[in-house]
Amino acid sequence: MQKFKSVEELVIQLRPEKPVYCIRKNSILSASTFFQNKFPGKILYAVKTNPHEEVIKTLLKSGIDQFDVASIKEIKGVRKFSRTAKCSYMHTVKSRESIKEAYFKYDIKTFALDTKDELMKIIESTNNAKDLELFVRVAVSNEHAE
């Protein structure tokens, strides 16, 4: 990955004709550290927001060690750099194969669901595992919301 001191330097050197993808690792580190110092709860980074490996590595370096993943590809992206980071499989509709792979190959214990069918799929695909952490999404009426 090429490094530049500024966007201006990048533009002068590359003279790009198409958009250029830039990752500002120091900004990621700074924002992550600030948020961790101010937020008292657990932080899960949603990998789908930016799954680039440099972003994942930078977040891990900053101390973020929990990730909201929505696919096996995202799990692999985190596991490439950390075997111990907690990945929570938060996509509410998953294939039986991806549940099995997540649980048995990547040691994922946390899953989201919003239907009984998805619950049964998770239970069956993990062979009735007793170490699951399940997040159930509940739809509530918003008829009185303002």
Regions found by a protein language model. Give the residues of each.
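A charged N-terminal "starter" segment
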Residues: 1-110, 116-132
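ATP-grasp fold ATP-binding core
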Residues: 133-139
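Active-site loop/helix belt of alpha/beta enzymes
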Residues: 125, 140-146
